[in-house]
A protein has these predicted regions:
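Juxtamembrane helix-loop junctions of ABC transporter transmembrane domains
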Residues: 21-22, 29-42, 63-110, 114, ...
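Alpha-helical transmembrane segments of multi-pass membrane proteins
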Residues: 15-16, 63-82, 133-140, 161-188, ...
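An intracellular "coupling" helix at the cytosolic face of ABC transporter transmembrane type-1 domains
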Residues: 11-13, 99-103, 119-132, 136, ...
Length: 580
């Protein structure tokens, strides 16, 4: 995992290395300062000339300034390296998600992916910053201070052998108690993000049912849970500071007590005042470095959850990949399902589709009907290879879809999914998702074919009118027609409408189908519908029942041979007549 994440440093290796170099310089200079301070204290005590004091003091000031410069440079390069590392992480996660198939996406919720690209990346960025700054600084300071303490202090350094283990034990205990609470916080972040995303997406439904108070209470509960767990963890971690202060004061007392006794008993031969002063500073450095190591341990363990979640995305292999020698041309819009069975995961016991054998000639109009859960959408999603079949094969233009270059195949197949989505931007910008090089004339023609031109021109800015995120400022029927126009701009060999005229009135629906027959006769048109009227003029109607083919034929044939089809048709026709 660490190796994978470290690979995201890439072009920011130099700032990372420079950070480490400057930190080593900063720590080295800081550790030398108490050594020279001891000389200054002894010089003042001995009453040497002022020039010697100024010389030693000047050296201390120079060392402090150099240490400051090294610290500033380390901070600058660390900030640059960590920001670049986070940028690369976000880029790699987003790029990986773009390569995912529907099968991959099904394993992660959208709220979880958002959390991984935001909160988790920030946590990992902070961990990286701590590693290249504090995780290097703290052990170095601990090591240098211990060495200098034993070099200078002699017997006084023995106090470290007592204080250090006590502090270390306390810090480890605090860390182990805090970590479970931090882990619980990150698990609950996803739930809160899901609540936020759900509420924002369904804001109109929430207001329509006057559920604002319920949603506020639900969000408040999720937020309170995070606050409670975070407070619990922070309360435990807060014990670090008083423990550190306690050990520091004990160390000061021991050093001063033992040092003063040694000075009195030896007449300053074993140790002097300057050395005691230095030992107090080194003791502070040692204890501070241990506290920093403890904080790093807690923070890194907290971040480990975020790192793990990022690693899961980065190491998720796309379920669909291009073959070694892909076919780069789709000959026509014919489709063949041969012994097709499909289930959404290998572990699933039940097949969503089973034993599908179906041939569709290029240029045909095919209607697909079936009850809720009959896997109509699943069937058509196999054509552009949004999923791979579990058994059997799907061929487009006489070639197995698994042999095509994915981009080539999907450019030949336009799918208007059941859940229509428009992006923030102008109507033109949205439509050019179908063909970024489409001319204004082609855009207008596609909209006329989709019966969208009239209402688009009624907007104040026409085709330059802005669409809000998700298309919230247009009606459901308008959104569907714009999505159909966008799909038509691809000039596909196969056009799939997955219940994409459900929000359109029957007259407009009929006009759209008439336009298809007149202007794109060579395109294979596959229409999933709830209304038989939307597909009764199709060249072939496919009826699905629980993922299996129930009947195939033309409208009149099915009326005569299939009782279920006839019953649904009569109900819909009778319902329409009663409504009229």
């Amino acid at each position: 995992m660490i190796k994978k994440l470290v690979s995201c440093i890439r072009e920011y290796k130099l700032p990372t290395i420079l950070t480490l170099i400057f930190i080593v310089g900063e720590v080295f200079l800081e550790v030398l300062i108490p050594f020279n301070t001891a000389d200054l204290v002894n010089a003042i005590k001995a009453g040497v000339s002022m020039s010697a004091v100024v010389k030693t003091g000047g050296l201390l000031v120079l060392m402090a300034m150099l240490s400051l410069c090294c610290g500033g440079a380390a901070g600058y390069f660390a900030a640059k390296a960590s920001a670049g590392f986070a940028k690369n992480l976000r880029h790699d996660i987003f790029s990986r998600v773009q390569a995912f198939s529907f099968e991959n996406i099904d394993r992660f919720s959208s709220a979880s992916l958002v959390t991984r690209m935001t909160t988790d990346v920030v946590n990992t960025q902070m961990a990286f910053m701590m590693v290249i700054r504090i995780a290097v600084r703290a052990p170095l300071m601990f090591l240098f201070a211990i060495v200098m303490g034993f070099v200078m202090g002699g017997p006084l350094a023995a106090t470290f052998l007592f204080i250090v283990p006590v502090l270390l034990f306390g810090l480890i205990l605090i860390g182990r108690k805090a970590l479970p609470a931090f882990r619980a916080v990150f698990r609950k972040y996803d739930k809160m993000n899901e609540s936020i995303e759900e509420n924002v997406r369904a804001m109109r439904v929430v207001k329509g049912f006057s559920r604002e108070e319920y949603e506020k209470a639900k969000f408040g509960k999720a937020s309170d849970n995070i606050c409670r767990d975070f407070t619990k963890a922070e309360r435990i971690v807060a014990l670090n500071s008083p423990l550190m202060q306690l050990c520091l004061y004990f160390n000061m007392v021991f050093v001063l007590y033992i040092g003063s006794k040694l000075i009195v008993s030896s007449g300053g031969q074993i140790i002097d005042v300057g050395q005691i002063s230095a030992m107090l500073t080194y003791g502070f450095m040692i204890l501070m470095s241990l506290m920093m190591i403890s904080m790093i341990y807690v923070m890194l363990t907290m971040s480990a959850e975020s790192m793990k979640r990022i690693y899961e995305v980065l190491c998720e292999e796309p379920a669909l990949v291009n073959p070694a020698e892909p076919v780069t041309e789709v000959k026509d819009g014919s489709v063949d399902f041969s012994g097709v069975s499909f289930k959404y995961s290998k572990e699933a016991k039940k097949y969503a589709l089973a034993g599908i054998d179906l041939h569709i000639d290029s240029g045909m109009t095919v209607g697909i009907l079936g009850g809720t859960g009959s896997s109509k959408s699943t069937l058509v999603q196999l054509i552009p290879r949004l999923y791979d079949v579990t058994e059997g094969s799907v061929k487009v233009g006489g070639v197995d879809v698994r042999d095509y270059d994915l981009e080539i195949l999907r450019s030949a197949v336009s799918v208007v999914l059941q859940k229509n989505l428009l992006f923030s931007g102008t109507i033109k910008e949205n439509l050019r998702w179908g063909n970024e090089n489409a001319s204004d004339e082609e855009i207008v023609q596609a909209c006329k074919l989709a019966q969208a031109d009239e209402f688009v021109r009624s907007f104040p800015d026409g085709y330059d009118s802005r669409i809000e995120q998700g298309g919230t400022n247009v009606s459901g029927g308008q959104k569907q027609r714009l999505c159909i126009a966008r799909a038509l701009l691809k000039k596909p060999k196969i056009l799939i409408l997955d219940d994409s005229t459900s929000a359109v009135d029957t007259k407009t629906d009929a006009l759209i189908r008439e336009g298809f027959r007149a202007y794109i006769p060579e395109t294979t048109k596959i229409i999933i519908a709830q209304r038989i009227a939307s597909v009764q003029d199709a060249d072939m109607i496919v009826v699905l029942d629980n993922g299996r083919l129930s009947a195939v034929g033309k409208h009149q044939q099915l009326l005569a041979s299939n009782s279920s089809y006839r019953e649904v048709y009569e109900q819909q026709t009778r319902g329409g007549e009663e409504h009229e």
